[in-house]
């Protein structure tokens, strides 16, 4: 046991290469998939005994070959290569087939004493067993053999005998040499090793050598067959050691298959086996599938009961197993049983289950692969071991592996050629190299510390810089103040008037001095005030006073801070360092100037009204902390000025107290005061604490079981990463997450599902609420039918008699329903909170918001829970819309009692209502956006303000929002559909949004209608309804009313647009359609109550007897079923309606008969008839023909008499027969202009169009019922026009293809033959089409201007007075304006260039001469904006000159270039090139960053060549980085950035990049090495020693001599160190460098002095700028932009920060270039402050 079973099919698949080789020798090709299909599925149906696993039985192969080669329809030519190859394997077997192909046995010897009747010898069995079998050969009884360990199959599948098998080999010769003596017939061979193992305790049978045995029937010692049933231990072991059939059908099927092969059970044994291993239901399913597999004589499954019962009986059959027929029946039965097991065990395909298998965190790839394969076997019909399925299994293995493993597997090179084993090995490597959790935590900790350290260092540097800048500014400020004070003092001394000798210096009076002045105050001298810091040591200045009162002390961040109350300050200010500062800043303007200061992060502030978070301005220069208007507003402070000073009081006039408040309740501090709520007193809260969310906590529906969310069959888990979230938003939703975690609504989890969390800011506050994006989950969840009530008709169940209302809004309603644990992982999301130790996923244990089925599930649950309340209170009306409840009663007492009962019920059920939103026992409430009062409903003011506050729409989306909002109020707006008609076309996709006067008028009318919206009565279902209907221009309008005393009270205003078909009917029929449409809409409000229809037309007669020419049968039936329901719909008298109110007028309207009007409007021509005219001038026959000939549809039309052809013409290819009929009929009418004509046609289409449908099409605008344009529109219009040409006309329909000899038959045949002949023989002439398209460009529409006449006179054109147009070159001349319109339209269609359109027009042979065609065409093509944005443009900008250094090492160009493959991580090469000498330095790098650039500049270039003066680079990220630019500023380097996408600007280094790459490529090919880093020095050597433009190499320019190649220096350098030759060489080098450098510098300077032709663009020009990276269908040019600045080679335009090379722009002015510009002249005006600008042509 445990070894594999080898079958012929598996054997050939294992040696498939040999099979293909044998097939090629047979000159055929075979495919593996078709080989398996034919062997296992096709050939077993031939009814020749072919087993599903193949056989090498030559007789069976021959029989299958006969079936395949059968002539006629029963043959199978596609199977010929495969059966021929199989035959070659059996008749000429390769070595691996020979052991399975048995030679034919010799004829058997007659037995000496047979104990059983003998059967005639035969070479092969008539029927096959479960596996292919060969006839065993006869032989002597061999010695018992020991089971070898050869690894071969344990069961000989190529023999028919049951265990023990007979030896298939020929009998061995006798030991004594009696070779001719055979073994006695009575001896039987030993059992096979397998049989010995299974049945070792039983005696081996002694059977006749000529009798086939079927176990458990075995021949005993006396020659009688014995029966050996299954043992109980076998059945017990099989049942307990194998999974059930439902759990793993494949494994149990394999077990039963092996039992059927090895044990050869009888019918009873099979039943016992099935009854033991299968359940009753499984057994019935297997038997049913087995009976379905029974095939009839034709090889197809049969359903004949007798054949099915004979092959697979359900009752014990009377088969005799001692006969060959009985054994054949048993073999066939086992085959069918096995087929039934296989079919019954085939589970439905569920790929979602397979995709749900993912690799665990610590699961090895091998274990995961086994689970994946097991899922394929269990949930799909595919075998994962099949080579054809290896690709699918490999892709599943990659996609469903752990994320880190999957990502690395996806990046493997040559992935498509990797086998599954290769992927597993790679995954094992990745799995074994994973970092441990400890290592990961250590890495994260280390990265966090490094990040914090960097941030701390940056903050310290910023703080130091800020302090340094602040000290510098303070120093400047102090110096300014001190100098100013000194100047003031000195200036004051100079300005003081001189005192007289007896004048007092204090009071300026004469007669005494200052010391004796009586006015001078006396007393002890007070302490001298301290000198202010601003005055330093100035003795003459007055010091700064301490800050005056009022002051107030508040706690900020837990620390007390004393603030100066400053009502003039907009924001509150802190002076001390408050900790971390935010990135936001503000500009502060003070008396000494303006400066930018930063904001603090949010700080907790304790106010009198609570604790709030607030952000302060950090102004260190401010002398005192300020309490500004922002905090004073939150404080609600009151400042009183009294004699003792200012006092700061609270909002109630009391001293400020400190109150601590949760941050999540901060928004309540900003809420405006509301009117006192008299309806909800404390008694309601105290009497029902469990019913309110404020007192009862979170609700839980106790009667509802946890909900299970079913997924779609093909759904797979979706995982979307969390979107980036700002710190403010995260802190805002953090309290909500914490609250939900504390309540158990959120719990941590690990789930393959993940959707992002979106923080949404509440309007008017700084609070956030978490909203989960569940759109992807909603797509994968099964849809359920929504049962939420429609708010449109919900209030129809509220009678006007119930005028006391209670409205309750359930709080957190969805959270009242629990989720089943199996469905909770669907709604997982990411959340990290280091303070709480949460870093992972959270999910909901309650029904979440945002889930598409949440409203329906909650609505149904609440309906079930409130069913008892409705039964117990039948007098109350309870309406429910999801979580909004409305309770209505007839009196206040009933309303109070009902409300108490409802609150008690809600509390007991576990639901919680919001006390803040409750409206209890009131006569006026707001519900679902309506205002309910006294049995009427009004639009709320908030709803009106929402519509009125919307600005004029600018986009289709804004318009859709407006129409959606206004459409909610359409019941209050009479004729809303007609009013909004101009707006709806602009909402369609692909329509140009053109807001015109009509749209603005409709927009204003809708807003005005909302302001005057009336009150609508609530529908009273106990009274009948009246519907007043009117129709105007395809719009149905109506008002639904009910009588209130003698008046009619409106219930709803209805309006709707009719469909295109009904809109084309006569007015009377349009009224029928309008009534039907509005009756259907009114039914939503009337709930099937009686309805009386009043209209200005007597439509009841029309509905009962509708005209047959306008309405289809389906529409007629629909109208009659809807409007002739007398129990529900009745028609009132005809009334005239007021257009404003849609109510009847007091006077009667004009009466008319609708049937008479319809009879008059049935056709286009009143005298058109279908009866022949007796006095007709002509009687013609028309016909059109359309046929296929040689794959092409040809068409023709003809007009004939009975004997001759009047007109016949071939029509363009592809013309339909209907169109040809219309053309023929139209041609006949044209030729009979002014005459009397009888015309016959056999086309029902043409006849009906002329008599009936033409007028209908014309009225509805030639549109179909779907609103699309009808077919053959032009032909129908031409026919309708031609109907009026004959004087009198009769169009008669005649049957087609008549065979009689009447005049109609002969004429019809003549027309048919002529049309067919014209279609086949003639060439269609497209230039002479019958239908003349109406064109606006006709001579009668031409209007020539004065300029046109002047141009025509110069051309020499002639004016035709009769035809009233000019003629030139024999053609009518088209005016200039017409030419422009035509050419502009053609260009908009084609967007061709000037030359292409000119050539196209010249070849078109236009019947008109287009005036000024070329000039107009050129103007159109040059001013086309679309062409300017897309078409390429040739650059006319000449090359500029390149600036070079004046000596080596002063001017470098730098660039990064990428070199692949990047060995050892080196992917980039940083190249430096000296622009003076051309010397190159290149460094391999692993990254392309600014850090690498600065490192190489400071460590390599500076120590060797000195500090550069100029660096030139492109605009790469490494060069424009702040790091690079800062280093350049500190070192005094002029860093020049070249134009973007202009490699010529960095031409020297770009060319050197190419040289290096080419050299490295050659070196790698020559050396065979792939390490380009190793070969780089050789490439640099070549570049440094290549002569430049002046014949010198960079090495010679730098060192003054060629490089040494073969001269090696003496190892002892001490002898030459101070030798005269070395000194002379150095002196010569100095002289040579000067002789070389000076001419080079002069040559470079000469290039710079050479004048450069600048580009033609100037400041103020308008240009298009090339878009270098265009996306799909994006224009090539963007703009236009205005030029602001220019250089000889570049431009600076408005709107783009970078400079743009002149080659990347093109002119956007109409002239096509900068040369063609307008001239502006400046003139003075009478007003000195105004000038006049006039534009002149160049």
From Swiss-Prot:
One of its GO terms (molecular function) is retroviral 3' processing activity. Changing residue 1244 to A: No effect on readthrough between Gag and Pol. It comes from the Viruses. Residues 430-435 are annotated as: Interaction with host UBE2I. Changing residue 209 to A: Strongly reduced reverse transcription activity. The RT polymerase active site binds 2 magnesium ions. Magnesium ions are required for integrase activity. Binds at least 1, maybe 2 magnesium ions. The modification Phosphoserine is found at residue 192. Changing residue 114 to A: Slight reduction in the number of virus-like particles produced. Mg(2+) 2 binds at residues 1183, 1312. A zinc finger (CCHC-type) spans 502-519. Residues 108-220, 434-500, 513-552 are annotated as: Disordered. Changing residue 192 to A: Complete loss of stable anchoring of viral PIC to mitotic chromosomes. GO terms for biological process: DNA catabolic process; DNA recombination; establishment of integrated proviral latency; proteolysis; symbiont entry into host cell; symbiont-mediated suppression of host gene expression; viral genome integration into host DNA; virion assembly. A zinc finger (HHCC-type) spans 1387-1427. Residues 741-932 form the Reverse transcriptase domain. Residues 1444-1602 form the Integrase catalytic domain. GO terms for cellular component: host cell late endosome membrane; host cell plasma membrane; host multivesicular body; membrane; protein-DNA complex; viral nucleocapsid. Its EC number is 3.4.23.-, 2.7.7.49, 2.7.7.7, 3.1.26.4. Residues 438-478 form a coiled coil. Residues 560-631 form the Peptidase A2 domain. A motif (LYPX(n)L motif) lies at residues 130-134. This is Gag-Pol polyprotein. The gene is gag-pol.
């Amino acid at each position: 046991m445990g070894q594999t079973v080898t079958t012929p099919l598996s054997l050939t698949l294992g040696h498939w290469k040999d099979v293909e080789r044998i097939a090629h020798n047979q000159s055929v090709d075979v495919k593996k998939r078709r080989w398996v299909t034919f062997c296992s599925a096709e050939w077993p149906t031939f009814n020749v005994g072919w087993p599903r696993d193949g056989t090498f039985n030559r007789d069976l192969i021959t029989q299958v070959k006969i079936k395949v080669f059968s002539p006629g329809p029963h043959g199978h030519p596609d199977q010929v290569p495969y059966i021929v190859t199989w035959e070659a394997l059996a008749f000429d077997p390769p070595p691996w087939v020979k052991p399975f192909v048995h030679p034919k046995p010799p004829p058997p010897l007659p037995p000496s004493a047979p104990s059983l009747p003998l059967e005639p010898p035969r070479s092969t069995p008539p029927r096959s067993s479960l596996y292919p079998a060969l006839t065993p050969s006869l032989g002597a009884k061999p010695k018992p053999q020991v089971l070898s360990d050869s690894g071969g199959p344990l069961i000989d599948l190529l023999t028919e005998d049951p265990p023990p098998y007979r030896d298939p080999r020929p009998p061995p010769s006798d030991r004594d040499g009696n070779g001719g003596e055979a073994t006695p017939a009575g001896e039987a061979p030993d059992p096979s090793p397998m049989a010995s193992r299974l049945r070792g305790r039983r005696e081996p049978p002694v059977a006749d050598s000529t009798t086939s045995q079927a176990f458990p029937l075995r021949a005993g010692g006396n020659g009688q067959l014995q029966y050996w049933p299954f043992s109980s231990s076998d059945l017990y072991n099989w049942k307990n050691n194998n999974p059930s059939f439902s759990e793993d059908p494949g494994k149990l099927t394999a077990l039963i298959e092996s039992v059927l092969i090895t044990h050869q059970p009888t019918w009873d044994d099979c039943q016992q086996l099935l009854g033991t291993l299968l359940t009753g239901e499984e057994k019935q399913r297997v038997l049913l599938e087995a009976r379905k597999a029974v095939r009839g004589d034709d090889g197809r499954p049969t359903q004949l009961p007798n054949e099915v019962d004979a092959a697979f009986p359900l009752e014990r059959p009377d088969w005799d197993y001692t006969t060959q027929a009985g054994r054949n029946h048993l073999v066939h039965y086992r085959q069918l049983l096995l087929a039934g097991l296989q079919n019954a065990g085939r589970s439905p395909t569920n790929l979602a289950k397979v995709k749900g298998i993912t690799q665990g965190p610590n699961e090895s790839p091998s274990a995961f692969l086994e689970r994946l394969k097991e899922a394929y076997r269990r949930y799909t019909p595919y075998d994962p071991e099949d080579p054809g399925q290896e690709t699918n299994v490999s892709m599943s293995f990659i996609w469903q592996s752990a994320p880190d493993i999957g990502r690395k597997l996806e990046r493997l090179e040559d992935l498509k050629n990797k086998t599954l084993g290769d992927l597993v090995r790679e995954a094992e490597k990745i799995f074994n190299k994973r970092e441990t959790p400890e290592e990961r935590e250590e890495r994260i900790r280390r990265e966090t510390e490094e990040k914090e350290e960097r941030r701390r260092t940056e903050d310290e540097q910023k703080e130091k810089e800020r302090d340094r800048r602040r000290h510098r500014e303070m120093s400047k400020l102090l110096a300014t103040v001190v100098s100013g004070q000194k100047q003031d003092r000195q200036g004051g001394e100079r300005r003081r008037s001189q005192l007289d000798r007896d004048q007092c210096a204090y009071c300026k009076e004469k007669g005494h001095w200052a010391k004796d002045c009586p006015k001078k105050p006396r007393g002890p001298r007070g302490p001298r005030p301290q000198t202010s810091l601003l005055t330093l040591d100035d003795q003459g200045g007055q010091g700064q006073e301490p800050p005056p009162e009022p002051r107030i002390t508040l706690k900020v961040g837990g620390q007390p801070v004393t603030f100066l109350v400053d009502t003039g300050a907009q924001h509150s200010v802190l002076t001390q360092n408050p900790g971390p500062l935010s990135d936001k800043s503000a500009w502060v303007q003070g008396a000494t100037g303006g400066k930018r200061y930063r904001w603090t992060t949010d700080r907790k502030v304790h106010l009198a009204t609570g604790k709030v978070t607030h952000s302060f301005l950090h102004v260190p220069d401010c002398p005192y902390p300020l309490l500004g208007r922002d905090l004073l507003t939150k404080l609600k402070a009151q400042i009183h000025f009294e004699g003792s000073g200012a006092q700061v009081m609270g909002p109630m006039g009391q001293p400020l107290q400190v109150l601590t408040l949760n941050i999540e309740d901060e928004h309540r501090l900003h809420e405006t005061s509301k009117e006192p709520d008299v309806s909800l007193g404390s008694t309601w809260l105290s009497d029902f604490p469990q019913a309110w969310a404020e007192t009862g906590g979170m609700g839980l529906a106790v009667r509802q079981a946890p909900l299970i969310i079913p997924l779609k069959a093909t759904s797979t888990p979706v995982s979307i990463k969390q979107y980036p979230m700002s710190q403010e938003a995260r802190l805002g939703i953090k309290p909500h997450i914490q609250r939900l975690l504390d309540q158990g609504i959120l719990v941590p989890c690990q789930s393959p599902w993940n959707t992002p969390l979106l923080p949404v800011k509440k309007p008017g506050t700084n609070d956030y609420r978490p909203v989960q994006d569940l759109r992807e989950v909603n797509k994968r969840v099964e849809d359920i039918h929504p049962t939420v009530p429609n708010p449109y008709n919900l209030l129809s169940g509220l009678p006007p008699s119930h005028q006391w209302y209670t409205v309750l809004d359930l709080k957190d309603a969805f959270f009242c329903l629990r989720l089943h644990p199996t469905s909770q992982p669907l709604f997982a999301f990411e959340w990290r909170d280091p303070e709480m130790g949460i870093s992972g996923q959270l999910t909901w244990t309650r029904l979440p918001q945002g889930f598409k089925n949440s409203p329906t599930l909650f609505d149904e649950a609440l309906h079930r829970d409130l069913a008892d309340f409705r039964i117990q209170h039948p007098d109350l009306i309870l309406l429910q819309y999801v979580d909004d409840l409305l309770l209505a009663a007839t009196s206040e007492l009933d309303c109070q009692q009902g409300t108490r009962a409802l609150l008690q019920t809600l509390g007991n059920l576990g639901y919680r209502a919001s006390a803040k939103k409750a409206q209890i026992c009131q006569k006026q409430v707001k519900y679902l956006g309506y205002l309910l009062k006294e049995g009427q409903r009004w639009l709320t003011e908030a709803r009106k303000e929402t519509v009125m506050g919307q600005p004029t729409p600018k986009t289709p989306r804004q318009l859709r929002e407006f129409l959606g909002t206004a459409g909610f109020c359409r019941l209050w707006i009479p004729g809303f559909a007609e009013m909004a008609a101009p707006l709806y076309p602009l909402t369609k996709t692909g329509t140009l949004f053109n807001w015109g006067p009509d749209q603005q008028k409709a927009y204003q009318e809708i807003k005005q209608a909302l302001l005057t919206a009336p009150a609508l009565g609530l529908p009273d279902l106990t009274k009948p309804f009246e519907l007043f209907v009117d129709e105007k221009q395809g719009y149905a309008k109506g008002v639904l009313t009910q009588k209130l005393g003698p008046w009619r009270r409106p219930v709803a205003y209805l309006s709707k647009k009719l469909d295109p078909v009904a809109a084309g009917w006569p007015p009377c029929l349009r009224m029928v359609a309008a009534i039907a449409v509005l009756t259907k809409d009114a039914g939503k409000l009337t709930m099937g109550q009686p309805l009386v229809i009043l209209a200005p037309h007597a439509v009841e007669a029309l509905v009962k007897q509708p005209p047959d020419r306008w309405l289809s049968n389906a529409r007629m039936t629909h109208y009659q079923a809807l409007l002739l329901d007398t129990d529900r719909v009745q028609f009132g008298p005809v009334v005239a309606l007021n257009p404003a109110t849609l109510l009847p007028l007091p006077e009667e309207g004009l009466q008319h008969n609708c049937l008479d009007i319809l009879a008059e409007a049935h056709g286009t021509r009143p005298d058109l008839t279908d009866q022949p005219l007796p006095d007709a001038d002509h009687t013609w026959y028309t016909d059109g023909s359309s046929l296929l000939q040689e794959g092409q549809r040809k068409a023709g039309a003809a007009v004939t008499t009975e004997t001759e052809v009047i007109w016949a013409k071939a029509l363009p290819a592809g013309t339909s027969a209907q169109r040809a009929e219309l053309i023929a009929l139209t041609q006949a009418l044209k030729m009979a202009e002014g005459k009397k004509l009888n015309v016959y046609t056999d086309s029902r289409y043409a006849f009906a169009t002329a008599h009936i449908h033409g007028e209908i099409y014309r009225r509805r605008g030639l549109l179909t019922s779907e609103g699309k344009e009808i077919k053959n529109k032009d032909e129908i219009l031409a026919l309708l026009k031609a109907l009026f040409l004959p004087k009198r006309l009769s169009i008669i329909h005649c049957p087609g293809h008549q065979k009689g000899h009447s005049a109609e038959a002969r004429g019809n045949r003549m027309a048919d033959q002529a049309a067919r002949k014209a279609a086949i023989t003639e060439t269609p002439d497209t230039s002479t089409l019958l239908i003349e398209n109406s064109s606006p460009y006709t001579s009668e529409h031409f209007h020539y201007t004065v300029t046109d006449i002047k141009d025509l006179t110069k051309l020499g054109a002639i004016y035709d007075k009769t035809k009233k147009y000019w003629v030139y070159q024999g053609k009518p001349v088209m005016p200039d304006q017409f030419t422009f319109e035509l050419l502009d339209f053609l260009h908009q269609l084609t967007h061709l260039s000037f030359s292409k359109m000119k050539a196209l027009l010249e070849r078109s042979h236009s019947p008109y001469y287009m005036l000024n065609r070329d000039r107009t065409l050129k103007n159109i093509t040059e001013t086309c904006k679309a062409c300017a944005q897309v078409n390429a443009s040739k650059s006319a900008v000449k090359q500029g000159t390149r600036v070079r250094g004046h000596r080596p090492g002063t001017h470098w160009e730098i660039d990064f270039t990428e070199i692949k493959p990047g060995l050892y991580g080196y992917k980039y090469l940083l190249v430096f090139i000296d622009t003076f000498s051309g010397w190159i330095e290149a460094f391999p790098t692993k990254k392309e960053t600014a850090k690498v650039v600065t490192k190489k500049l400071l460590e390599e270039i500076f120590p060797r060549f000195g500090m550069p003066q100029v660096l030139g680079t492109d605009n790469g990220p490494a060069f424009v980085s702040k790091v690079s630019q800062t280093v350049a500023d500190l070192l005094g380097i002029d860093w020049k950035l070249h134009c973007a996408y202009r490699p010529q600007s960095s031409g020297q280094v770009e060319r050197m990049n190419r040289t290096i790459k080419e050299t490295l490529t050659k070196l790698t090919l020559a050396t065979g090495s792939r390490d380009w880093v190793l070969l780089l020095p050789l490439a640099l050597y070549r570049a440094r020693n290549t002569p430049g433009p002046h014949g010198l190499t960079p090495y010679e320019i730098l060192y003054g001599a060629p490089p040494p190649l073969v001269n090696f220096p003496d190892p002892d350098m001490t002898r030459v160190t101070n030798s005269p030759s070395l000194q002379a060489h150095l002196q010569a080098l100095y002289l040579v460098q000067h002789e070389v450098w000076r001419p080079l510098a002069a040559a470079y300077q000469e290039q710079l002095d050479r004048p450069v032709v600048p580009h033609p663009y100037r400041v103020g020009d308008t240009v298009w700028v090339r878009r270098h990276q265009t996306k799909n269908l994006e224009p090539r040019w963007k703009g236009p932009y205005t030029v602001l600045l220019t250089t000889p080679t570049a431009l600076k335009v408005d709107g783009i920060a970078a400079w743009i090379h002149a080659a990347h722009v093109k002119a956007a002015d109409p002239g096509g270039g900068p040369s063609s510009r307008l001239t502006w002249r400046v003139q003075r005006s009478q007003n000195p402050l105004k000038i006049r600008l006039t534009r002149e042509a160049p």
